[in-house]
Amino acid sequence: MARPLKVGLDYFPLDVNIDDDVELLEAECGLEGFAILIKLWQKIYATGYFIEWNDDIELLFSRKINADKNTVNSVINACLRRNLFDNELFQKYGILTSRGIQKRYITA
């Protein structure tokens, strides 16, 4: 009998010397912004290396993590500005991902 295919990752690396863009996100959005980013990474890596993002998903995600929808939206916009997520792919396909996310997924 074939082994079932694994979807997503059980863990992802979080460097102790975090990227300056993440530090800037935390400076801009506070610890809540940092926590939202980590929760987004968890959601992404749980299923692969990107997630679709739209108003309904944002509403469900906000409810799940008990955060204000406007705060989540503000953090995502800051992540897009700071290239923590690829803005071009977000605008074109409505997905949250980045080269770094994809690289970590492939090497994990």
Map each language-model feature to its residues.
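Short acidic, hydrophobic short linear motifs in intrinsically disordered regions
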Residues: G48-R63
